[in-house]
Amino acid sequence: MTTLRLLISDSYDPWFNLAVEECIFRQMPATQRVLFLWRNADTVVIGRAQNPWKECNTRRMEEDNVRLARRSSGGGAVFHDLGNTCFTFMAGKPEYDKTISTHIVLAALNSLGVMADASGRNDLVVKTPDGDRKVSGSAYRETKDRGFHHGTLLLNADLSRLAIYLNPDKKKLAAKGITSVRSRVANLTELLPGITHKQVCQAVTEAFFVHYGERVDAEVISPDKTPDLPNFAETFARQSSWEWNFGQAPAFSHLLDERFTWGGVELHFDVEKGVITRAQVFTDSLNPAPLEALAERLQGCLYRADKLQETCEALLVDFPEQEKELRELSAWIAEAVR
């Protein structure tokens, strides 16, 4: 009986694909070696412990219908589009070893005519006259008895969009600049014009089979019917939920300030698990009562633009004479946290 399992997703939904990955990882026998191949439509994928409001331009993402997906592994934020080929290798311990999966990906690239090397902990790079350029990045997750290595191969990704949706660390930005960060990345189509997602998947699959000396038929995973995976519906519901993607952010504080014709306003929020735990309002408005009431009502509110707007507009019942101010305030808060 084979110890290999090959799964290929025909969905571009990041929440679907990450839910499939999670279910397979949790229920696989410890003796199995799994390769899962997939790709996502426009998505920012963040690490398990990251704050989306800090890492991403959430307002621009909403405008452009770019999804946010939190993965279960650590590491940084990345932008996925259909120009990325994603892979996940899984194995039980003690066999799990990320150097094996890295070797398989390097062998696949080599078979296509691309000589790449592992660099640092997470990257695969190719040497060019301009220096090393990254063609793959990875992240890892381990539990007591198993582990996985997942990553992307940059096939024909729209690299310019990295700068639009990801807010780089200001120190990195000052030191390197957006252009130099972008120049360190390369698409495989620059090295192999015409290369396709299907060809990359075939190369990785063949290298996987060769390494283990076994072959197995691929299982195609489709959203057209619920995958036959234990607890998939619950896992997908969690993976696609606001509570997981936004609410799992580490505790943080947010300061908003604005000057209106009727006065200046400063809002201080403390947020834990996507919920406002403390709100303070400072203002030089001649009528601070509605703002003081707002601070009280915001405690316990979800840190979501629509919920903040609802809370603000609910004050119109108690303060109808301040309708103009409250509507301006409501629109500003919603825009500031979107």
Swiss-Prot record:
- In what residue span(s) does the BPL/LPL catalytic domain sit? 29-216
Going by the UniProt record, its keywords in alphabetical order are: ATP-binding, Cytoplasm, Ligase, Nucleotide-binding
The disulfide bridges present are none
The secretion signal range is none
One GO molecular-function entry? lipoate-protein ligase activity
Q: How does it assemble?
A: Monomer.
Name of the protein this chain belongs to: Lipoate-protein ligase A
Q: Which organism is it from?
A: Salmonella newport (strain SL254)
Gene name per UniProt: lplA
